[in-house]
C-alpha cells in the first residue's frame, strides 16, 4: 500500500469526507507525532490527511 493515496483506498470517499484512521503502513516523523497526540479513533478528513501525510503514508480507514 506504500504510496497509495488516501482517496485510492476507498471508493466513494471524497476529499473532506470524515474518515477514521485505523493503521498507518509507513511512518513519518510528523505522522508519528500525531499518533502520539491523537488516538487512533480520531476523526479526520481526507483533506487533512492529505495535508499531513501526502503520499508518504498509506492509510486504512473506514468511512463513518
UniProtKB/Swiss-Prot annotation:
Keywords, comma-separated and alphabetical: Aminoacyl-tRNA synthetase, ATP-binding, Ligase, Nucleotide-binding, Protein biosynthesis
Enumerate the catalysed reactions: tRNA(Ile) + L-isoleucine + ATP = L-isoleucyl-tRNA(Ile) + AMP + diphosphate
Q: Signal peptide span per the entry?
A: none
Query: GO terms for molecular function, please?
Result: ATP binding; isoleucine-tRNA ligase activity
One of the GO BP terms on file? translation
Which EC number(s) are documented for this chain?
6.1.1.5
Entry keyword annotation includes Metal-binding: no
On assembly, the entry states:
Member of a complex that includes annexin.
Q: Which family does it belong to?
A: Belongs to the class-I aminoacyl-tRNA synthetase family.
Q: What is this protein called?
A: Putative isoleucine--tRNA ligase
The organism is Physarum polycephalum (Slime mold)
Amino acid at each position: 500500500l506504500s504510496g497509495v493515496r488516501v482517496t485510492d483506498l476507498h471508493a466513494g470517499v471524497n476529499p473532506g469526507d470524515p474518515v477514521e484512521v485505523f493503521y498507518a503502513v509507513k511512518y513519518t516523523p510528523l505522522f508519528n507525532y500525531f499518533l502520539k497526540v491523537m488516538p487512533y479513533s480520531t476523526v479526520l478528513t481526507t483533506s487533512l490527511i492529505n495535508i499531513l501525510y501526502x503520499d508518504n503514508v498509506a492509510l486504512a480507514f473506514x468511512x463513518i
